[in-house]
């Protein structure tokens, strides 16, 4: 029998086995940043929704470069991040076997989009979730018990995490169920953390209070699902020669005769995509503010820069494909991230302490592209397109009734 006379490394990484569909749709934080009591109390993560991608132009200002102020065009991802609502707090005590939940306190009022998450069919349900938990805030005995619970939390707990949910009504989705998550509080003492929660219960927390410009963060998400794929697409194994019997996109040898079973490290066909992944060190290029009123006028210039002063929004012409318009606060991250459009994304503060020039570099954008992402767009704004193309038929039809009325 013939065989190849050279060796080659195996195809595919075994560190992410098993390659099967994720059990959860929202990215789960399995490790939190180390707590530093000297810092003020702050959240360590946030939730957003992937809108799409565009590109930017900026000057690189890293000290030590051979070419100073070199211009670079870079791809960026837009993640829409409406404010989160704080609806509860969980205290954890330290045990020899790790952390254990000690007390859980929910807010007095929970919105329907939050309570929908606890029902499979909200329309047919009796909608009684959290009715007993809410009554504690109204009678005298319940208020006394709540004060005791908060005091016990300050005395015994080592870790404080808040329960937050997203606001689906602010997003261009049909989905009404909010995504709920526990986020750890870092900084300050335990008493200060509990006081932080009490002051912000049932209130909104914006993204700019969690992250800062040019910060390096981690992105946790479930990747885009690809369905059932063959071994060549799933593991990138080499295709067999043209005249191979019964197919080319296969693995010729799947192991020895004995042991009489197929090993776990052998590349096989199966599920590809929809895997839970954590990607480290994503740099924030911009934390943009959503559309808002200022002096009686709507402000939409969250895509303007000091070099490009055009009054334009981050939403490209025609909207982001398969998403729509971004009208809320957003985060612009360098490069691509896991997940498809509208996928919920977990943004976490970095676990590492960064010292590199690239991580500490301050980002100043010169230009943000807002051309249409559906086709080959060449106009940055609708006004620019109309000035170049001239009046369209729909504009002329609007002007006709006005001229007839004046006559």
From Swiss-Prot:
Source domain of life: Eukaryota
Tissue distribution of the protein: Expression is restricted to striated muscles.
Biased composition regions of type Basic residues, renumbered to the chain: 1-31
GO biological process entries: negative regulation of myotube differentiation; regulation of striated muscle tissue development; translation
Keyword list, A-Z: Ribonucleoprotein, Ribosomal protein
A Pfam family reported for this protein in Swiss-Prot or TrEMBL: Ribosomal_L3
Quaternary structure (record): Component of the large ribosomal subunit (LSU). Part of a LSU subcomplex, the 5S RNP which is composed of the 5S RNA, RPL5 and RPL11. Interacts with NVL in an ATP-dependent manner. Interacts with RRP1B. Interacts with IPO5, IPO7 and KPNB1; these interactions may be involved in RPL5 nuclear import for the assembly of ribosomal subunits. Interacts with RRP1B.
UniProt name for this protein: Large ribosomal subunit protein uL3-like
Species: Mus musculus (Mouse)
High-level lineage: Eukaryota, Metazoa, Chordata, Craniata, Vertebrata
Gene behind the chain: Rpl3l
């Amino acid at each position: 029998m013939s065989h190849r006379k050279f060796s080659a490394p195996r195809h595919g990484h075994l560190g992410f086995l098993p390659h099967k569909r994720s059990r959860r749709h929202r990215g789960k934080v399995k490790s939190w940043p180390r707590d530093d009591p000297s810092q003020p109390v702050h959240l360590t993560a946030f939730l957003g929704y992937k809108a799409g991608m565009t590109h930017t132009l900026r000057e690189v200002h890293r000290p030590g470069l051979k070419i100073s102020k070199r211009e670079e065009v870079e791809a960026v991802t837009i993640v829409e991040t409406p404010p989160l609502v704080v609806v509860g707090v969980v205290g954890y005590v330290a045990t020899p076997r790790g952390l254990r939940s000690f007390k859980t306190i929910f807010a007095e009022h929970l919105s329907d989009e939050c309570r929908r998450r606890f029902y499979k069919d909200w329309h047919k349900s009796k909608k009684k979730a959290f009715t007993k938990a809410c009554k504690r805030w109204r009678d005298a005995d319940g208020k006394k018990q709540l004060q005791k619970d908060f005091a016990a939390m300050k005395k015994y707990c080592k870790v404080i995490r808040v329960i937050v949910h997203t606001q689906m009504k602010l997003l261009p989705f049909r989905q009404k169920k909010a995504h709920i998550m526990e986020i750890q509080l870092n900084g300050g003492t335990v008493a200060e953390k509990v006081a932080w929660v009490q002051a912000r219960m049932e209130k909104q927390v914006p993204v700019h209070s969690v992250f800062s410009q040019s910060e390096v963060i981690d992105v946790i998400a479930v990747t885009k699902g690809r369905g059932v794929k063959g071994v060549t697409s799933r593991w990138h194994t080499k295709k067999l020669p043209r005249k191979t019997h019964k197919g080319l996109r296969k693995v010729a040898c799947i192991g020895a005769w004995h042991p009489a079973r197929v090993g776990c490290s052998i590349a096989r066909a199966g599920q590809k995509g929809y895997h839970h992944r954590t990607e480290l060190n994503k740099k924030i290029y911009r934390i943009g503010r959503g559309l808002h009123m200022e002096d009686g006028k709507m402000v939409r210039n969250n895509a303007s820069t000091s070099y490009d002063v055009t009054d334009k929004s981050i939403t490209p012409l025609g909207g982001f494909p398969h998403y729509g318009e971004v009208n809320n606060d957003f985060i612009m991250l360098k490069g691509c991230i896991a997940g498809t459009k509208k996928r919920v994304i977990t943004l976490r503060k970095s676990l590492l302490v960064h010292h590199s020039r690239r991580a500490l570099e301050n980002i100043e954008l010169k230009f943000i592209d807002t051309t249409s992402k559906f086709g080959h767009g060449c106009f940055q704004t609708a006004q620019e397109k109309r000035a170049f193309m001239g009046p369209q038929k729909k504009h002329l039809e609007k002007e006709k009734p006005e001229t007839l009325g004046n006559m």
